[in-house]
C-alpha cells in the first residue's frame, strides 16, 4: 500500500515537471486613425468568447498585449503567435509572431493589409487563436480570441483584389532553413525493443515469485517493503520505456525517468 502511494505521488510530481504555459493580463484593442470610429474598443481576453466577432477595416489596427506565464512566473517562450484561419476552410491560415520582452510581456500589431489576399477575399470570418509553447511540448497552449470580420473599404479594395496573373508572376524568394524530417526507427530494432520489454516483464514476474516466500508483502517491516518497492520501481521503469517508445517525447521521458531512478535508488539503499 505504501508503495502504491509513493508511485502515485511520483506520477503527480513528474507531471509537474512538464512545464505548462498560460497568459495573463491579456487585452485586445482595436484602434483607428478616425477618432469618431465606432469600431474602436478595448477588450480583456477574459471577455472574449469563441463566438465574439469584431471587425477590422482599412484604417484600423488590431493590437494584442499579454504576459506569457510559465508555472506562475513571467517568462519568454520559444513561440508566441496569433493564428488566423478561415472559419469555413481551416487549412487556409496564417501565423503572426508576437514580440516578447523580458518578463514575458508580449505585444502584436496587425493591420488590414498585413493579412494575405486569399484571406481578405474570403466571405467568412477568420478564427483567431493565440498559441504559446516551448520546445519539447507536444501540444501548445491555445487561447481562442473570437472571430475577425474583414471589411475592405471600396476605395481600398483594388489593393486586395485578386488577379490570376498573381499566381504566375515571380514570387519573392523566402530564405529559411528547415530542420530535417525526423528519422523513422528501424523496423527490426522496433521489434527487438518491444520483445525485450515483454521478456523483461516476464523476468520480473519470476523475481517476484522468488521474493514472495522470503517476506510477507503486507508486512510493515523495512525489508519486505524495500523488496516490494524495488519490484514496483522496475515494473514502472519497464512500462515507462514502452510508453516513451509509443507516445512520450524525449523531454517528457527525461522528467519521468529521473523520478523512476530516484525510486530505484531508494529501494536499493533500503535492501
Curated annotation (Swiss-Prot):
Residues 1-18 form the signal peptide. Residues 19-187, 252-271 are lumenal. One of its GO terms (cellular component) is endoplasmic reticulum. Its main location: endoplasmic reticulum. It comes from the Eukaryota. GO terms for molecular function: transferase activity. It is found in: Endoplasmic reticulum membrane. Keywords: Endoplasmic reticulum, Membrane, Signal, Transferase, Transmembrane, Transmembrane helix. Residues 209-230 are cytoplasmic. It holds the Pfam family Ribophorin_II_C. It is a multi-pass membrane protein. InterPro entries: Ribophorin_II_C (IPR056790), Swp1 (IPR008814). The keyword Methyltransferase does not apply. This is Uncharacterized protein C553.06. It comes from Schizosaccharomyces pombe (strain 972 / ATCC 24843) (Fission yeast). The lineage of its organism: Eukaryota, Fungi, Dikarya, Ascomycota, Taphrinomycotina.
Amino acid at each position: 500500500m505504501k508503495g502504491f502511494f509513493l508511485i502515485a505521488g511520483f506520477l503527480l510530481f513528474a507531471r509537474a515537471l512538464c512545464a505548462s504555459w498560460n497568459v495573463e493580463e491579456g487585452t485586445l484593442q482595436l484602434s483607428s486613425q478616425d477618432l469618431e470610429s465606432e469600431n474602436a474598443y478595448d477588450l480583456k481576453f477574459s471577455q472574449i468568447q469563441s463566438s465574439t466577432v469584431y471587425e477590422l477595416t482599412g484604417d484600423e489596427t488590431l493590437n494584442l498585449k499579454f504576459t506569457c506565464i510559465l508555472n506562475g512566473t513571467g517568462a519568454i517562450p520559444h513561440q508566441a503567435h496569433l493564428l488566423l484561419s478561415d472559419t469555413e476552410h481551416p487549412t487556409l491560415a496564417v501565423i503572426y509572431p508576437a514580440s516578447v520582452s523580458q518578463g514575458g510581456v508580449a505585444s502584436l500589431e496587425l493591420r488590414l493589409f498585413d493579412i494575405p489576399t486569399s484571406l481578405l477575399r474570403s466571405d467568412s470570418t477568420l478564427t483567431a487563436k493565440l498559441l504559446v509553447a516551448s520546445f519539447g511540448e507536444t501540444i501548445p497552449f491555445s487561447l481562442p480570441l473570437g472571430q475577425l470580420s474583414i471589411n475592405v473599404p471600396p476605395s481600398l479594395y483594388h489593393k486586395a483584389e485578386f488577379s490570376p496573373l498573381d499566381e504566375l508572376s515571380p514570387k519573392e524568394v523566402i530564405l529559411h532553413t528547415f530542420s530535417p524530417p525526423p528519422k523513422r526507427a528501424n523496423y527490426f530494432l522496433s521489434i527487438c525493443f518491444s520483445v525485450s520489454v515483454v521478456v523483461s516483464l516476464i523476468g520480473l514476474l519470476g523475481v517476484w515469485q522468488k521474493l514472495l516466500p522470503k517476506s510477507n508483502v503486507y508486512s510493515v517491516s523495512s525489508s519486505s517493503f524495500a523488496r516490494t518497492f524495488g519490484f514496483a520501481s522496475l515494473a514502472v521503469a519497464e512500462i515507462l520505456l514502452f510508453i516513451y517508445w509509443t507516445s512520450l517525447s524525449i523531454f517528457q521521458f527525461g522528467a519521468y525517468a529521473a523520478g523512476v531512478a530516484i525510486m530505484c535508488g531508494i529501494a536499493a539503499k533500503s535492501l
